């Protein structure tokens, strides 16, 4: 409880309310004003600006704790990159997911050339604490450069349609981008996408693949993990 008090020191609202607001923001397609209204309906009067500050401050903390609790990813990674417009300039969002659709990493860069691909590969290898068994990408040549220089022994599949899993994984980001009316800066976008990926992965339970009983059990475990990282 001492850690909880220290983390939420100088905040007049209880930790339970703050962590719930942060969870709502990163779990669902809601704006800060939407969450302000949801809390007001429960008799909790807090400004959308306070909610924004909570999300910016505590979101990365919770995300880092979730990553430390994670057991690991599957041994097959799907990589893809899409462009996002930030302050009128085209940037590239690199993303890697595993076979379960869990997000391994997201990384914003201004290019998608060989050096950019190598930077992304280095992050992946560091986060995974080693090489995966195989990687799946599209036919962008930059992936071949990074694969040859950094992990030549890893199987590399770039066949047509093999990378659909990674391409589909961008959809939640596109939805949030519209809700937020585009990202305001590289720093803000990287922070949001990193936390969003951690929360998405925690609650990515494959609802359509398991029974209702199994889903409720997995959901309870996910909620417990969230309580641990946010309230202890």
Regions found by a protein language model. Give the residues of each.
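RNase H-like two-metal-ion nuclease catalytic core shared by retroviral integrases
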Residues: 159-175, 184-190
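C-terminal domain-tail junction helix/linker
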Residues: 179, 190-232
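Short conserved beta-strand segments at catalytic cores or DNA/RNA-binding microdomains
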Residues: 29, 87-103
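Mobile genetic element proteins and their domesticated derivatives, centered on retroelements
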Residues: 21, 35, 51, 80, ...
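Short, basic alpha-helical nucleic acid-contact segments in DNA-binding proteins
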Residues: 45-46, 53-75
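Two-metal-ion RNase H-like nuclease active-site motif
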Residues: 73-86
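Active-site beta-loop-alpha junctions of metal-dependent nucleic acid enzymes
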Residues: 12, 57, 106-128
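DNA-recognition alpha helix
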Residues: 31-44
């Amino acid at each position: 409880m001492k850690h909880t008090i220290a983390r939420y020191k100088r905040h007049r609202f209880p930790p339970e309310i703050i962590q719930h607001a942060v969870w709502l923001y990163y779990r669902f397609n809601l704006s800060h004003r939407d969450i302000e209204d949801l809390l007001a309906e429960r008799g909790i009067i807090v400004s959308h600006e306070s909610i924004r500050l909570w999300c910016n401050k505590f979101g990365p903390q919770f995300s880092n704790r979730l990553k430390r609790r994670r057991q690991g990813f599957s041994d097959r990674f799907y990589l893809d990159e899409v462009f996002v417009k930030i302050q009128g300039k085209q940037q590239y969002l690199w993303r890697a997911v595993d076979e379960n659709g869990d997000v391994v990493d997201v990384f914003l860069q201004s290019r998608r050339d060989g050096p950019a691909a190598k930077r992304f590969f280095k992050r992946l290898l560091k986060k995974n604490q080693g090489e995966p068994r195989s990687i799946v990408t599209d036919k962008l040549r930059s992936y071949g450069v990074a694969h040859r220089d950094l992990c030549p022994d890893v199987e590399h599949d770039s066949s047509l349609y093999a990378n659909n899993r990674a391409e589909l994984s961008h959809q939640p980001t596109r939805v949030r981008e519209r809700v937020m009316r585009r990202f305001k800066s590289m720093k803000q976008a990287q922070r949001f996408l990193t936390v969003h990926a951690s929360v998405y992965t925690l609650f990515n339970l494959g609802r359509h693949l398991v029974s209702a009983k199994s889903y409720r059990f997995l959901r309870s475990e996910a909620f417990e993990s969230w309580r641990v990282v946010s309230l202890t």
